[in-house]
Regions:
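Conserved N-terminal segment of class I S-adenosyl-L-methionine
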Residues: 1-63, 77-80, 110-118, 122, ...
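Short N-terminal helix/helix-N-cap motif within the alpha/beta-hydrolase-1
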Residues: 74-78, 99
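A short glycine-rich, Lys/Arg-flanked "PGG" loop and its adjoining helix->strand segment in the class I
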Residues: 77-89
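A short beta-strand submotif of the Rossmann-like class I SAM-dependent methyltransferase core
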Residues: 63-69
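Short, glycine-/aromatic-enriched active-site segment of Class I SAM-dependent methyltransferases
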Residues: 89-113
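Active-site flanking residues adjacent to catalytic metal/cofactor-binding acidic residues
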Residues: 23, 67, 89
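A structural motif corresponding to the C-terminal end of an alpha-helix
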Residues: 123-129
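A structural micro-motif
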Residues: 20, 41, 85-86, 129
Length: 173
């Protein structure tokens, strides 16, 4: 986990200034705390609302991060379509040898979407985002077994930096 946090921080530093007001989708967690400890003091988290329905908060920010959030949303299209500015988002990639993640005891802890790179890119493009940079990371899981071994050879995480033109209201002449 620490290695993924450090790679995430490096990617964020490349694209967002530490003094920017940033909305991090999802409740406060170890990664958002790590980013704050490394200078991103204006990072705010959502408070656990259902972002499929209640996503208007994104319109108040021009920089949004979403670290492994969109796979948990039933309809991420709506939130992405409503937001503008800068976006850094990461998703775990669908792997041909692994079943989707589904926690039967907690409906919020399920993957409604297991994205391929092409699918995630298409989602961003359909909602007006232009991908400017991306990275692929392999899993650093030290567990034993066939799946953990295969995850060391196939990219497991996909992180993108994208921008969406902020639409200006037509001025009256």
């Amino acid at each position: 986990r620490q290695k993924r946090f450090e790679k995430t921080l490096s990617f964020v530093k490349k694209h967002l200034k530490t003094d920017e007001a940033i909305l991090d989708l999802g409740k406060t967690n170890k990664l958002s705390d790590f980013l704050r400890q490394n200078g991103y003091v204006n990072l705010a988290n959502t408070s656990g609302e259902d972002l499929d329905v209640d996503f208007q908060i994104v319109t108040k920010y021009r920089a949004i991060t979403a670290f492994q959030i969109f796979e948990h949303m039933f309809a991420p299209f709506n939130l992405l379509n409503s937001s503008e500015g800068k976006l850094i988002a990461s998703v775990p990639l669908r792997l041909w040898f692994a079943k989707e993640y589904w926690n039967v005891n907690d409906r919020r802890d399920c993957h409604y979407h297991e994205f391929s790179i092409r699918q995630f890119n298409h989602l961003l493009e359909r909602t007006g985002w232009k991908i400017k940079d991306y990275q692929l990371w392999k899993s650093y899981d030290k567990s034993w077994g066939i799946r953990p071994l295969l995850r060391r050879f196939y990219p497991r995480f996909y992180i993108v930096y994208a921008e969406k033109q902020i639409l200006q209201a037509d001025s009256e002449e």
